[in-house]
Amino acid sequence: MHLDERKILLALDGSEFSETAIDTTAALARRLDAELHLVRVTSPLLSTAPELFPNLGQEFTNQAQDGARDYLQSLAGRFAGVSLQLHTPLGNPKEVISQVAMEQACRLVVMASHGRTGVARWLLGSTAEFVLRHVESAVLLLRPQAMPSPQGDFHHVLVPVDGSATSREVLAKVGPYLADGAKVSVLRATGLTARDYTLLNNPQEVTSYVQHLKEQLGHLDAHGLKVEPQVIDGEAADSIVHFAEQNGCDLIAMSTHGRTGFRRFILGSTTEKVARQAACPVLAFPTHPVA
């Protein structure tokens, strides 16, 4: 599937929580010169007495859709300078958001999501996780407590790698989302495979691996990005989240699968765990077409 690099989808549910993603998404759309698709899903409403009021359910549904469109139109002023398309489809939010993203071939889907604490209306494990697994777009999960700059760019991104080509592809894709001169921490968390144990227990091999990464990532330095490879010991998800917090990262960028090549998360469930636990925004890139 060919994605349109000039289309972004923002999912809203009418809550103040979901609206925390508006300003960042608008800034991203301006920076990327992208058309923005606002989606507010409504559920079909059924009459409690269809035998007496056969058309009442449809009337309620029509009113709900009209209300959803009015809601999206009321937000238009916050997207000055951005081309908008409004969508008020019926159905299950997780399925409909994914469907609209694929029909419109959006490069990016943006959603507000809690990290670490609280329970979002769109809980990872339901809507956000479903979207992560089923769209070919990149998915940006924003945290209300840790929004990027007003320009919608990021200044210190953490990119975990596992030695697979798919995880390294993230480095080629994350550039447009970064500020000029941004810092890129490339992290290899060991302790996952026999190869990782060998790497960890051989300081010379660690040094060699870091040097190899620096050589591979030299092109990023040429684009004004400050690249710092790191190798640390620990379980992947915990190490990633801890490193991001300790080093002030304002974005974690990952692929949705790594070594296995299956349509799952990198190294089993690492991306899912990071998306649940990280305090900063998480940007997930699929690396192969959906099966």
Q: Whereabouts are the PLM-identified features?
A:
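Short, hinge-like loop/turn segments at secondary-structure boundaries
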Residues: 54-57, 103, 127-128, 157-159, ...
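Active-site phosphate/pyrophosphate- and oxyanion-stabilizing loops and adjacent acidic/basic residues
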Residues: 26, 73, 129, 155, ...
